[in-house]
Amino acid sequence: MGAPLCDNAAAGSTAPAFNVGVRLHDLPEGSVEKRILMAGELGFTCIQLPSKVVYKSYGIDRTGLDEDLAARLRAVLDEAGVHVAVFGCYKNLATPDAAQLAESLEDYRACTRFAALLGGCAVGTETGRPNAGNKVADDRFEPAAMDAFCGGLANACELAEAAGVPLLIEPGWNEVVNTPERCREVLDRVDSTALGVIYDPVSLLHPTVAAQSADVVRRMLELNGDAIRVLHAKDYEVVDNEDSDGWCDGSGSRLVCHGAGETGAFDFAPLADWARKVRPGIDCVIENSTPATNVACRDYLLGL
C-alpha cells in the first residue's frame, strides 16, 4: 500500500524532522513564479501548489497545463531551491452527479500528467461530500458516502498510476473520510500503488474531541502511518459559537484554524518524533499562516 518504512538509525536525534513548506497562496500577492522565489527566500524547502492558483496566475484552465509551463516552473523551482510537495486538485470525488464526476476526473487527468511533468510530485485531493453542492452535512457519515468516494477515488487513482505519480487523500472532519478508521477503510478498499495520505492532524479534530487530540493522532499513525507521505501543519482555537461554517459538531463550539504553533493548542512535537523515526525529512506544509506569521510558523516546526 505504501513504501517500506524508513530506517532513521543513522540520522541521529538532531536531524531535522521535516522539510518545511508553505502553501503558495499563503504568501503575499504575486505571480506563481514570484511566490515560488519568495518561498525560497523565506527559507522554505517545499511548497503546496494549488492548480486553481496556477490557473488564476496564468489565465488558463486545465488545457494550459502543458510541457512549456512545466519547464518554466521547473526552472523557477530550481532557482528558488524548493520543490513541489503537493500539486493540489481538490475536487469532490464523492459527488452523486455523474456528469460532475466525469468533469472532475478530467481535471485529475490533466493534473496528474502535469505533476509528472513537474518531476513526479504528488497530487493532493480532498475526500469529498456525497452531494453535488459539496455541502457539509450529515450525509457524509453514511456508508453510501464511503461507497461513492471509494468509487470516484479508484477512477482517479487509475489516472495517477497511468501518469506515474502519487495521489494523496487528505482526511478531514468536514468530509467523507473524517476519522482515522475511515481512512484505513479507504486504503483497504482502493487497491492502488498510487494511493497515499496527506495527514493534517488538526483537520481530523472538532470541538468534542479536541481535548483527546493525542489519542486521535495515535490512532491515525498506528492505522495509516505506512501510507502518510506529506504532513500539513496548523494550529487552532475553540470558539463558543457555530455561527459560521467550519469545524463544527453540534456542540455549540467550532474550531478556528491558525498557522502552526500560533495558539499552542495543538502540539506538533509527537509528529516530529514520529517523522524522525519513520519518515525523516517528510514534507510538512504549513497551512493557515499569513504573510505576517509564516516565518514564525516555519521556525516553530524547525525547532521541534
Give the residues covered by each predicted segment.
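A structural motif
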Residues: 44, 115, 120, 228, ...
